[in-house]
């Protein structure tokens, strides 16, 4: 059984091993694979594992030996799952492996803004505190999270984890969600889209990307938000219109934008957000703690093992 990993570096830059997979077959690992290389590298594979390598219908048709695709991520839009099903190829994903890590990054971004961490660390490097006349130095106030309203778009595993953390900070929590109000904890208020935009001091996006959520945050929705609001996106880049967000930051109608995801990844050097000092951007690393990647690695092997035993799990193209 030949197992080919097409972009192994994404989830394993070298600090993990593949011993669980190696028990299941011959494992060939490529750190990265371009579109021009993917057919040649996968042509003899029974099993292909990938993170961001695209597998469209045309590519799948050129891989007659392929029986299984294991996506090393939760999202599965990199594979044409309909075409895979028609060709008898089982496709699986890894749900919920990064919930804690992404929720943690969400609050790392929020606290970086509300506590002005980057600003004051740089001021210390510039010796502003050392030459200050008082025991403490500050030139701009911090913001307490208690009693502020956190609005959440999407209450899946990550959205709910973020809500639980926010509760410990004493925040008021509202959510725009497809879940019924009766199914939510009493401390989460279900609101409309308009209510979410209007009441949130901090608005955090945790919904899937689809036709309904594409550019959920755009020029029109930004006009309905508080000009003191902080917008956080650790979901998917295209949930926001980045040009509209940059414009709102520039004219002061949005206080800050925190994001671990971008519409184009890696982003263009011409992206307007680079010019905005109140844009706090991290390079799609919220999911990538060692612990999350270790869970991912183990679940990838468990998915492959279940497939080989004839009882596939986490199948996304049933």
Model region roles, listed by residue range:
Residues 1-92, 198, 218-220:
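An N-terminal-biased, well-structured beta-alpha scaffold segment characteristic
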Residues 2, 148-149, 172:
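Residues that mark the start of a beta-strand
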Residues 55-60, 179-272:
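Rossmann-like adenosine-cofactor binding region
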Residues 87, 95-149, 164, 316:
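Phosphate-binding beta-alpha-beta segment of Rossmann-like dinucleotide-binding domains, i.e.
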Residues 87, 91, 172, 228-318:
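Rossmann-like dinucleotide-binding domain for NAD(H)/NADP(H)
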Residues 155-156:
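Glycine-rich Rossmann-fold phosphate-binding loop(s) that bind the pyrophosphate
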Residues 159-160:
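N-terminal Rossmann-fold NAD(P) dinucleotide-binding loop
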Residues 163, 167, 249:
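Gly/Ala-rich phosphate-binding loop of Rossmann-like dinucleotide-binding domains
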